[in-house]
Structure formats: structure tokens, C-alpha cells
């Protein structure tokens, strides 16, 4: 990245991609916050969206905290985390992020009219980015490089869903 900074033309590509990422992710918030006139009264969809946002935010914060605490212990150096939320999902932090942005889009559903439905691009973009482009594919590839031959990791990978946990199902 530092090499890109020395050339304005080459630096423009990642900068533009980051700007696009921010715009697409914030799209639902922008549509909600730029409504003219009086805001519609809060309804069922607002409650569902807010609840989903709270769940997503909580999952992401808890997952990140658990991973930070795990990585802070010297005896865990070079190991993968498979405790807490990470015992139910291989990427609970990404699950939280996806739920959070989906909750925001649902919260604004009463505001969306016509072309404003483009706000749904936000959670769709976040999901596709994290599951198909950057997050999960890169981390899964790295995990396979590090622990792919380890039978315990193979068992963890086989028994732990990528994102959405199997509620009520015990791990093997």
C-alpha cells in the first residue's frame, strides 16, 4: 500500500474502491437520513430492523472481544479460535456486520419508495463483499494454509458453519 501512495494515479484505484465501498455500505443510511418532510411513525419494521441491528452489533463486538482476548494469551500463538461465538460460526464478526447493515435497511423500509429501494444494495453489498470477495475467502484460504493438515482444524471446519450457526445443534 505504501508503494501505491507514491503514485497518485495508482493510489487513486484503491482510494476510489474504498470510497465506493463506503458509499454502497452507507446507502441505506443516506436514503433514510435524506428524507424530506415528516418522518413516518415508527412501526413493526422499524422494531425488527432495530432489533436486528442490536443483535448484529452485539455479535460483532462480542466476537471481536473474544478474538482479541484469545490472541492476547501467549499460549494461543499460532492457534485458531474455536471458543465462544467462534465455536458456533467460523466468522461470527462478519455475521454481526451483515446483520447490522441488514437491520439498518429494514429499519428504513417505510422510507423507501421507488428508486430509494436502491438502499437494499447496502446489506447485499456487505454480504457479497464479506462472503465472496474479501473477508471469508481470504481468511479461509489463510486458515487452510496454516492448519489445513491439522485433524482438529479439519474437524472444526467440517462441524462449524461459515456464518450462520446451527441453533440447538451440539458441536462434535
What are these regions (language model features)?
Residues 21-66, 71, 75-172:
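Hydrophobic transmembrane alpha-helices
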Residues 1-13, 79-86:
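Juxtamembrane helix-capping/reentrant segments at transmembrane boundaries
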